[in-house]
Curated annotation (Swiss-Prot):
The gene is thrS. Zn(2+) binds at residues 343, 394, 526. This is Threonine--tRNA ligase. GO terms for molecular function: ATP binding; metal ion binding; threonine-tRNA ligase activity; tRNA binding. The keyword Ion transport does not apply. The lineage of its organism: Bacteria, Pseudomonadati, Pseudomonadota, Alphaproteobacteria, Hyphomicrobiales. It comes from Bartonella quintana (strain Toulouse) (Rochalimaea quintana). It catalyses: tRNA(Thr) + L-threonine + ATP = L-threonyl-tRNA(Thr) + AMP + diphosphate + H(+).
């Protein structure tokens, strides 16, 4: 006698079905059109093949191609079709792995001759053929012995290695599409035809097997896929726009920074770039002062014993740089390390003097330079480096102060992003992971506070911020908020964090004296707004396409003389601009004025003031804005007043205007 399962549908209805009924049969029982459109089903939040039997009760949803969750299936299936196409065209090629990644997928291949960009066109054409065949995806469960034998016969040595690494108690799933098959966890759609034609192979790169430089180098083909052609076109257009805005190219054109092979992941800041960086620090320093933070500075190099106590040496050592004096008889037991994080140093500063509950909250902030090892292949301009500056802060407070501190941090973060022109912000609360420190009651209490804070933020900033909860995504030492902002071309960047920490205060025995004269462990909050300041500056450069707001621009105004007769007048204007705090310089070179304008425009100078004999006689200038061919004639007094106001940062403008 068949057992039945009870299923709850999105509309709230419930119904019993046979235990062995498949997802496809269930969809067909609802409607033939739904079965035709279905690509998978979700049971209790887990996506499954339509061919899978139901097997258990719970919440069920039929996933169609229009469902956002189908996009991962489309890309996953596309990766399989890519592998089949490659082996049809280049039979000697071994396949390895092909996961879905953000905005697409890739597949790594082993062959003597790496693929070229020209090969991608041929492979893409073959993929369209395979999709057109509309072969069904079919799953089989193989024994480990059978899988090893068959993949060994096919000379798929990387697959054999993968099979050997799979735990003995885990099923080996094999997915067929026609005669071609691959080792895969699934799930997949019904057939290759459901992938559609909205895909494109993007680039070829080298990649070490399993990311280990000691292993063979493979060829990685990257691709992207979408549910429809319009989404694909929009994505490709965004990539074109992103290439134009690439901060690495703009950094060269604007003379901001450079990198060298003998300092991989280390930034050589030029004068203009460093000025822009200092503008960020000056802005944040004022904001911190307004919010009663104390700026501190902890050592760059600390003994290994401190990192062992903090736990970093145990779980983060591979990302740290050791610092050992270059002395022949130096004791190897005495090892120092460059700090990868600022938090242990801040705990030491907090502990240095006895604190009463009346002293709390203590808010310690630092523009702390940290060093973290990143593989050379992961380095990317300012976005991914080995040495960077964090606008880090750590708040030590009582349990009763936690909610207010989180709300204060949120106000600071959102107002900061608004000052830089970011209007679309999302906030995610990540809750307890499976592996964690602290009791369940401690987590319950902290999460209840954070959820209450989230609701307050939702109410206060209704329509201004998107919120969500990510179960199980918190750090092992406490729940956290993550702030993500959207830039001018629709890309999302995770920047700010507010992280509750149960771990470090206990490890370092940090305490304060409560009103009953008893020792109490403070609540510790890690807080960052920019995150990596270098990365945030890279985001700003790309967001503004180098057209920085006047208050952020490293070189705000250039006064360009048309002829040598106007040189003295140009110097006079420049001096007056500098006197009111503007960053200005004169261009008195014996060059044509159009050449000067073009050169300074390429360097993204926001304002060019052109002056000649006529301007000198009338005590005026011709103002030209970056990105515009229009020229506006103004008196020097009007010009100075206009630029002085515009060059004022938003926070200073607020303080003046009240």
């Amino acid at each position: 006698m068949s057992c039945s399962v009870s299923l709850s549908f999105p509309d709230g209805s419930k119904r019993d079905y046979p235990n062995e009924m498949t997802g496809l049969e269930l969809a067909a029982s609802i409607s033939k059109s739904l079965a035709k459109k279905a690509v998978a089903y979700s049971l209790n939040g887990i996506t499954r093949d339509l061919s899978d039997p139901l097997g258990q009760s719970g919440q069920i949803e039929i996933i169609t191609r229009e469902d956002p969750r189908a996009l991962e299936l489309i890309r996953h299936d596309c990766a399989h079709v890519l592998a089949e196409a490659v082996q049809e065209l280049f039979p000697e090629t071994q396949v390895t792995i092909g996961p879905v990644i953000e905005n697409g997928f890739y597949y790594d291949f082993a062959r003597q001759q790496p693929f070229t960009l020209n090969d991608l066109t041929i492979i893409e054409k073959k993929m369209h053929e395979i999709i057109q065949r509309n072969k069904p995806f079919r799953k089989e469960i193989w024994s480990r012995k059978k899988a090893r034998e068959i993949f060994s016969e096919k000379n798929e040595l990387y697959k054999v290695e993968l099979i050997d690494s799979i735990p003995d108690n885990q099923d080996l799933k094999i997915y067929y599409q026609g005669d071609w098959f691959d080792l895969c966890r699934g799930p997949h759609m019904q057939s290759t035809g459901q992938i559609g034609n909205a895909f494109k192979l993007m680039k070829v790169a080298g990649a070490y097997w399993r990311g280990d430089a000691h292993n063979p180098m493979l060829t990685r083909i990257y691709g992207t896929a979408f549910a429809n052609e319009n989404d694909l076109k929009a994505y490709l257009h965004m990539l074109e726009e992103a290439e134009k805005r690439d901060h690495r190219r703009l950094g060269r054109e604007m003379d901001l920074f450079h990198f060298q092979e003998d300092g991989p992941g280390m930034i050589f800041w030029h004068q203009k770039g460093w000025k822009m960086f200092q503008n960020l620090i000056s802005y944040m320093r004022r904001r911190l002062d307004d919010h009663q933070y104390s700026e501190v500075n902890a050592p760059q190099v600390l003994d290994k014993s401190l990192w062992e106590l903090s736990g970093h040496w145990g779980w983060y050592k591979e990302n740290m740089f050791k610092a050992i004096p270059a002395i022949e008889d130096w004791d190897d037991k005495c090892i120092y390390a460059l700090k990868p994080m600022n938090c242990p140093g801040h705990v030491q500063i907090f502990k240095h003097s006895l604190k009463s509950y009346r002293d709390l909250p203590v808010r310690l902030a630092e523009f702390g330079v940290v060093h973290r090892y990143e593989p050379s292949g992961a380095l990317h301009g300012l976005m991914r480096v080995r040495s960077f500056t964090q606008d880090d802060a750590h708040i030590f407070c009582t349990d009763e102060q936690l909610a207010d501190e989180c709300l204060n941090i949120n106000d600071l973060i959102l107002s900061t992003y608004a000052d830089f022109g970011f209007k679309e912000i999302s906030l995610k609360l990540s809750t307890r992971p499976e592996k964690r420190v602290g009791s369940d009651s401690l987590w319950d209490h902290a999460e209840n506070i954070m959820e209450s804070v989230l609701k307050t933020i939702e109410t206060k900033f209704a329509g201004q911020i998107k919120t969500s909860i990510l179960p199980g995504e918190g750090a092992f030492y406490g729940p956290k908020f993550e702030y993500t902002l959207k830039d001018a071309i629709g890309r999302e960047w995770q920047c700010g964090t507010t992280q509750v920490d149960f771990n470090l205060p206990e490890r370092f025995d940090a305490f304060y004296i409560d009103k009953d004269s008893e020792k109490r462990q403070p609540v510790m909050i890690h807080r960052a707004i920019f995150g990596s300041m270098e990365r945030f500056l890279g985001i700003l450069i790309e967001n503004f396409a180098g057209h920085m707001p006047l208050w952020l621009a490293p070189e705000q105004v250039v006064v360009a003389a048309i002829t040598s007769e106007a040189n003295e007048y140009a110097k006079k204007i420049t001096a007056r601009l500098k006197a009111v705090g503007l960053s200005a310089k004169s261009d008195l070179r014996n060059e044509k004025i159009n050449y000067k304008i073009r050169e300074h425009s390429l360097q993204k100078v926001p304002v060019i003031l052109v002056c000649g004999k006529r301007e000198a006689e009338t005590n005026s200038v011709s103002m030209r804005r970056l990105g515009s061919t229009d020229q506006v004639f103004l008196s020097i007094e009007e010009t100075i007043e206009q630029l002085k106001n515009e060059a004022m940062s938003p926070d200073l403008r607020r303080s003046i205007n009240g």
